């Protein structure tokens, strides 16, 4: 395994480690060796908000399952989660943000106007006031043209993460 990922594990907060441990423990119940099978690994990672493709999952497993046992212990799991978090913070998230922008941009004109923002936020089912919506629009609309373009949207969403 790469030392860079092992070093990154050391940078995880106790809260992150505890969250990962809790998820890992759910799936390790009943396992005599304290390891989870590679079949269960995808479920654990999805539970933690990661969404690796089957190919990515198999690649990660192959990299950490050095003895070919088909199981992953907690230390190996932490290294995998760090890797997944790193991958999620680039590339994929840009694609996801692009998809999200297109969802908001109902008329596909390349901008999110106040009505589109209002429609999407109300569709979430959350209680949100007109003032809240206007405040969000003001925060996102950096050039004050009354609409949010893609670059403004990216900048706004990066501040949210």
UniProtKB/Swiss-Prot annotation:
Pfam families: EF-hand_7, EF-hand_8. Ca(2+) 2 binds at residues 105, 107, 109, 111, 116. It comes from the Eukaryota. One of its GO terms (cellular component) is cardiac Troponin complex. Ca(2+) 3 binds at residues 141, 143, 145, 147, 152. The modification Phosphoserine is found at residue 98. The keyword Metal-binding applies. One of its GO terms (biological process) is transition between fast and slow fiber. SUPFAM superfamilies: EF-hand. Residues 16-51, 52-87, 92-127, 128-161 form the EF-hand domain. InterPro entries: CALM/Myosin/TropC-like (IPR050230), EF-hand-dom_pair (IPR011992), EF_Hand_1_Ca_BS (IPR018247), EF_hand_dom (IPR002048). CDD domains: EFh. Keywords: Acetylation, Calcium, Metal-binding, Muscle protein, Phosphoprotein, Repeat. Belongs to the troponin C family. Cardiac muscle Tn-C can bind 3 calcium ions per molecule. Domain I does not bind calcium. This is Troponin C, slow skeletal and cardiac muscles.
